[in-house]
């Protein structure tokens, strides 16, 4: 019989992307979830993730603390910015880079993804973006 479950904190290991830390809360290992992943993402001030996408998984996120800027599109030339209290959606198969543009405030995001926490890192795609994203985040 299936029963509701409580997970205290997001501490489970899950797929990672350089520049940020993901911790699983709700997934197949913690509660036997088959069609949803929930977790917490944190990033230090003035940092960026590597380029990645989430395959067939869509991502919905809530910004708990700080600011997250998501670069996407041709040459990662476009971005959206979400602040504490905002919700964010990233469609399936969209390559992106997450940036914490703040020079002094960490970023914390709660995310839900389905059907699973698919992470496809794109290590060759971000070299040129890192310099541009960090320059943009510091006002340059």
Identify the function of each model-found stretch.
Residues 1-35, 50-51, 124-140:
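A short, N-terminal "cap"/entry segment at the start of jelly-roll beta-barrel domains
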Residues 22-24, 39-55, 92:
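Conserved short histidine dyad/triad with adjacent acidic residue
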Residues 30-31, 56, 75, 103-104:
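Short strand-connecting beta-turns/loops that link adjacent beta-strands
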Residues 38-41, 60, 89, 104-122:
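A short hydrophobic beta-strand segment most commonly corresponding to one strand
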Residues 40, 53, 72-74, 100, ...:
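Residue-level recognition of conserved beta-strand positions in structured domain cores
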Residues 43-44, 82-102, 113-114:
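Conserved metal-binding segment of the jelly-roll/cupin
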Residues 48, 57-84:
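A short beta-strand-loop-beta hairpin characteristic of the jelly-roll/cupin
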Residues 56, 75, 94-95, 115:
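A generic "binding-loop/recognition-motif" signal
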